[in-house]
Amino acid sequence: MSHFLFEIGFEEMPARFLPGLVDEVKKLFAEGLTQAKVDCGTIAAFATPRRLVVSVPDLAAAARREEEVVSGPPEKVGFDAAGAPTKAAEGFAKGQGLDVSAVFVMDTPKGRYLALRKTTGGEAAIELLPALCLEAVKKLSFPKRMRWGSREFAFGRPVHWFLALLDDAVVPFQFDDITSGRATYGQRIMGPGPFEVPTAAAYFDIIRDKGKVVLDAREREGIVRSQAEALAKEAGGTAVINPALLAEVTGLTEHPVVLLGRFDPKFLDVPREVLITSMESHQKSFAVEDGKGGLLPVFLTTLGLVPGNVELVRRGWQRVLTARLEDARFFWEADLSASLETWQKKLENVVFLAGLGSMRDKGKRLERLCGLIAEQAGKPEIMLEASQAGGLAKVDLVSDMVGEFAELQGIMGGIYSRRKGQSKTASRAVAEQYLPAGPDSPVPATLAGAILSIADKADTLAGCFGLDMAPTGAADPYALRRAALGICRVVIEHGLRLDLMELLQGAIDGYGEVKFKVDRTHVLAKLLDFFGQRLKAYFTGQGYDTLVVEAALGASYTDIAALSARLSALAGFAAKPDFDQAVLTFKRAANIIRKQGVGAGVPLTGAVKAALLEEQAEKDLAAVCQDVFPRFDALFDAGDYGAVLELLYELRPSVDAFFDNVMVMCDDMDMRLNRLNLLKSLVDRLGRVADFAALQV
């Protein structure tokens, strides 16, 4: 087996591009080698800011040889009456690169046809690899591409070299004016190169020892983490490591070195969140905290090389960070001198969305809607403070701090509200209003925060749908899918018993005289359908079977917390060995009622007349229903859906016997209607748990 190595060298690539490039280049070479029939072992890929590397240490020297039978024209046109090959046979053989003497006749389901046995493959790997390298370079995708010089070709950043080796041989190709070779380049300062690489296997030692490049991103990340933790410990604290920032600095350096710097303790009067954000966003630096969670006046930054003069570099970083912290301190002090009333007044000039009023209008809607949600959820004790939080929710949008650090919106609102005399509960809710910020983000920890989060998202959804701005395809500029999913998660994780229809109607009503482009009754219907789609996506993403999710949604989904509990119980029911047979029984009943919604022109009510029960099986079913239904209703109202589904095992034998021995659609219309009503009473209760007709077994 041979060792293949391919390196694309380029100018500094944005850190966010690198993980995708690693995955994509592995996939491109895996597909290309498979298509070329070149066997290989594991394909590894690595990326730094200046290079993308593919390594295939176990590559076959040549493509597999395979014999295939190629069919041609029918026998009757391939040979003449004397049995001699015709022009058609000769053309067929020539087209396959073989002599006509190799043609034979093959029996097929369609008759007798000319055929050839053809051997393919066997090409040397070094002959196939140039095309694969070129194809990979052309197909790599980037969030943004650029052109340079007079080239028509676009790439993530300008390309400077290609290293391509199969063992000790150069894989020859040229792209634009760049020719592949055996030269590589190292870290710009510590090991610039070029370095000649004699073999593919030698590349890794050369790039590390001479080029001073740590190729593996996982190793670079480990270096940053371990050095940061060690330096923080020496300073008497613990590094505050943001995973996103750790990934970013890992992608910004080829030879990471962590440096500890210090700043004036006077800046510790500024809130922790502000200091950390300033360090992370402007200086790509980590904060250090003490054992009580308070920040220490030190920071950790990641360099891309070992500095020649450590103290000079440290002073430079400290000087730059100090300037940033001075700005943050100025914003903090300026904001503390402003009043909430002044900010509320300024919000009148901040547009929420064109046609939906100002941010002050939104704050008033949230104040009202938070109170409604607290009342609907049966949480009157939190109603006042939740409403207060709604009114304060957007005040920090006009603060100097949020003007500089937009990512602190909400967080600063909570801090400022508390500093300006608002309750701890309301202030905490303001700080949590934007949670969850994504699928992996936590939901608000407090009840008031949960209510404000729901209200804020519901208000945005109602307004956008009212202006006919629902998401279409992949386009979702206002993150409405995330907003709906956020509401679902908050409701489920807090166990809030909210009626989704009432919630959304309350949000729609909050817009008062605002003119919608869509009729308000249609807005509600579209929103409910939208939530149904989001709930399906959410629960299937949680691992639930699609049919089980659809069955649970088919019963009802306006009580999201109850839906989650019903779905969990239904999934447990579906895992039982006799699930399929039970479903068939109750699905049959559901299908009959679906088709016979009106019996003999009379709407079915579920009311059964005992005097019309004639067959023993229908009498038995009526008796079992009379016994089970009160327990069913009590358990359902208590939310014990697992116990509700267990009752189906008590019902099923009588239902099976009913279908085996009773003619539902009999000639006697009164009796038919009574039997349909008996099934209706059963299906109505089953339908509160799941739409059994939607289950396919």
UniProtKB/Swiss-Prot annotation:
Protein name: Glycine--tRNA ligase beta subunit
Family annotation (InterPro entries): DALR_anticod-bd, Gly-tRNA-synth_bsu, Gly-tRNA-synth_heterodimer
Any one GO MF annotation of this record: ATP binding
Group of enzyme by EC: ligase
Protein EC: 6.1.1.14
Annotated Gene Ontology cellular component terms: cytosol
Main location as per UniProt: cytoplasm
Record-level GO BP terms: arginyl-tRNA aminoacylation; glycyl-tRNA aminoacylation
SUPFAM superfamilies per UniProt: HD-domain/PDEase-like
Subcellular location: Cytoplasm
Span of the signal peptide: none
Domain of life the protein comes from: Bacteria
Reaction catalysed by this enzyme: tRNA(Gly) + glycine + ATP = glycyl-tRNA(Gly) + AMP + diphosphate
Entry's family note: Belongs to the class-II aminoacyl-tRNA synthetase family.
Keywords: Aminoacyl-tRNA synthetase, ATP-binding, Cytoplasm, Ligase, Nucleotide-binding, Protein biosynthesis
One Pfam family it belongs to: tRNA_synt_2f
Oligomeric and partner information: Tetramer of two alpha and two beta subunits.
